[in-house]
Amino acid sequence: MATIFDILNTLNNNNFKNCKRQCPINKSNKTIIDIIPSMDVTMTNDKLIIETELAGISKDDIEIDIKDSILTIQGEKKKNLNKQQQQLVSEKSSTSPSTLDSKEDEPSIEEFEDDIKPKSATSTTTTTTKENKDDENKTKSSDKKFISERSFGNFKRYLDLTKVLYQLDLNSINTQFENGLLTITINKKLHYSNTIKININ
């Protein structure tokens, strides 16, 4: 006879297969899964403990829910930008003009005539612009990656609790997230049974 540890071990090892076979898929909104986190599941005399490695992820980017006896842990591991990258992103967002503003800011015929410059001034401006672009390209190309092994993107992990759900008190769920380790603790019911006796009227 299989023990509770055998059941949980089977569920944990076959997690990806269970996900494909049992979990409902929303075809209209498919999400590409980039990371499948590692998980440890332990059953003690009075509780179920689920530990999931989520290093480098903020707790605000983690979602946990139980639906149709399936525990789902999902979210996104975002890539942190350095100061130079953040500055470039903010500059692009602040300098990109909108279509409406560009039409309103177009100069009139009189303004065109007043702003006509001699060819020498125009060529000087063009040269300066090219120099600025060259400086920007040099700055961008100064960052060189020698090793890139870290993974970023969406993560999701399923755990099918169907065979042990009758033992668990779902109102006692407790979660902790510390040092990249998510710990979910679910207490077992004081009195439980997988058999329901039905009286005949």
From Swiss-Prot:
What are the alphabetically sorted keywords of the record? Answer: Stress response
Which intervals hold domain sHSP? 30-201
Annotated stretches, region: Disordered: 85-143
> What is any Pfam family matched here?
HSP20
Q: What PROSITE patterns does the entry give? A: SHSP
The keyword Coiled coil is assigned to this record: no
The record's CDD domains line, in alphabetical order, gives: ACD_sHsps-like
Basic and acidic residues bias: start-end ranges = 130-143
Residue ranges, compositional bias (Polar residues): 89-100
Q: What are the inducing conditions?
A: Down-regulated by Pseudomonas aeruginosa, PAO1 strain and PA14 strain infection.
What the record says about family reads: Belongs to the small heat shock protein (HSP20) family.
Name of the molecule in the record: Small heat shock protein hspG9
Gene from which this protein is expressed: hspG9
